[in-house]
Amino acid sequence: MSNVSSKGKSLSAKPGVEHWITRPTADGDIKLFLWQKAMTGGATSAGTRRGTVLFVHGSSMASRPTFDLEVPGRADSSPMDWFAARGFDTWTMDNEGYGLSDKHRNINFNIENGADDLAAATDYITRTTGAKQFLIYGISSGALKAAVFAERHPER
């Protein structure tokens, strides 16, 4: 995807970067998959990025097909690319039980668990990039996970 900034300079998202984190639970550790895209041209340091967006999927889908689907001929099909091209550091993750993240615990993957996953993800993103506050965008039950997370962690 490519866009043109107000200065006529071409902006585009970098290829995605895969990240893995481990979240401890009462039943043992779980591995969670995170996906990151940022703008090319070095605009990803804490001093130059416009913000950090964390996209949260719903209950019947995984993160990348929802937020980073690239459709040939449709430049704005990936919300991650759209925001990255405008200077945001963008992240998404597969909550436990979805996509590439662990699915081995015999539990109901509910809103509370999703909010716990978001806390682990934002801890990791803060350690990795220095971001301290997040713009959280959730769809379907992802919006509920984001709301519970925001209620628990208003400082983020």
What are these regions (language model features)?
Residues 3-48:
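N-terminal cap/lid segment of alpha/beta-hydrolase-fold proteins
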Residues 41-88:
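Short, surface-exposed "cap/lid" segments of acyl-processing enzymes
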Residues 57, 92-94, 135-139:
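Catalytic nucleophile loop
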Residues 132-137, 141-156:
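Conserved hydrolase catalytic core segment
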Residues 34, 46, 65-68, 101-104, ...:
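Short, solvent-exposed loop/turn and secondary-structure capping segments
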